[in-house]
UniProtKB/Swiss-Prot annotation:
A lipid is attached at C22 (N-palmitoyl cysteine). It is a lipid-anchor. Transmembrane segments: none annotated. Residues 1-21 form the signal peptide. GO terms for cellular component: plasma membrane. InterPro entries: Lipoprotein_3 (IPR001595). Keywords: Cell membrane, Lipoprotein, Membrane, Palmitate, Signal. Pfam families: Lipoprotein_3 (PF00938). A lipid is attached at C22 (S-diacylglycerol cysteine). Belongs to the MG439/MG440 family. This is Uncharacterized lipoprotein MG439 homolog 2. It is found in: Cell membrane.
Length: 283
């Protein structure tokens, strides 16, 4: 398949990840994203997900660190350099992430799924997402360090612009959060519904997603490259920390028992599919 490259990624990767002289074609491919692009451009293989997984797996078995660095570079490039979360869903997105998917399915994202709201607010997670009223989101930072599958850290910061109570359903939820308890006392730090009227409903939020080695036995390895499910499974524990520029929201995150749960949460035993990000970078 003859492909026209839309971008070059050499500048993305440090010199330690650039193409090195070695006998294995697979290792050469995964040495950098740009070399993977060149591999498919030269018609050495059809660009499809199974072939990408096959090549990356062979590369991992030859040089694990370079393969993982290429995967993480693809994740970073697609999220931060391409600003995937700021774009409309198009044919390129669908090819990489699948039909029926949207930006809420991207890892990470400020969305009901991306924030795992159902695990914290079971039964009303969709309303919580509406309370946040996400208007836009931008990846501001993406830093990673990888030494081994038991020693790594990926940290991604997303800034978002939101509007508290952007619809009637979320306004009702806010009202229930701010209502007095059975004893007639208010435990919201003095925050009232009127604190979110008009322009006061607008705020900037900052969500930091930190991925660290899984505390369970599963770790990233050759079996993580799965051509049957067309996934590259990346096991990790995840911590999500939230802050905002809205003084009253920050007060609620300290004082209100429901709202404070979103401020800092940790999830164990999660698995994240990194293939769509690498594949998106190649399209």
């Amino acid at each position: 398949m003859k492909l026209k490259l839309k971008f070059l990624l050499i500048s993305l990767l440090g010199s330690s990840l650039l193409l090195s002289a070695c006998s294995s074609a697979a290792t050469q491919v995964i040495s950098s994203l740009s070399s993977a692009q060149k591999y498919f451009e030269s018609s050495q293989g059809e660009l499809n997900k199974k072939n990408v997984i096959k090549i990356l797996k062979e590369g991992y078995e030859s040089d694990a660190n370079k393969a993982v660095h290429a995967l993480l570079a693809g994740w970073k490039y697609t999220l931060m350099d391409q600003q995937l979360l700021s774009k409309e869903v198009d044919s390129r997105f669908i090819k990489a992430f699948g039909s029926g998917r949207d930006k809420g399915d991207v890892t990470p994202s400020v969305s009901e799924k991306g924030l795992y709201l159902n695990e914290t607010y079971t039964g009303f997670s969709s309303q919580i997402a509406k309370v946040l009223g996400v208007q836009s989101q931008t990846v501001k930072q993406f830093n990673y360090k990888w030494s081994s599958n038991s020693d790594f850290k990926v940290q991604i910061q997303i800034s978002m612009k939101g509007k508290v109570g952007s619809d009637s359903e979320s306004q009702q939820l806010i009202k229930s959060f701010l209502s007095s308890d059975n004893n007639g006392s208010n435990q919201n730090g003095g925050v009232k519904e009127t604190d979110f009227n008009g322009d006061s409903a607008n705020f900037d939020g900052f969500f930091t997603f930190t991925y660290t080695p899984p505390t369970q036995s599963r770790k990233f390895g050759a079996t993580s490259f799965d051509p049957l499910t067309t996934k590259i499974n990346f096991p990790a524990d995840l911590q999500i920390d939230v802050s905002t520029t809205h003084q009253k929201l920050n007060t609620l995150m300290e004082a209100n028992e429901q709202v404070k749960q979103i401020k800092s949460r940790k999830f164990t035993g999660k698995t994240f599919d990194l293939l769509p990000f690498f594949y998106y970078a190649l399209l």
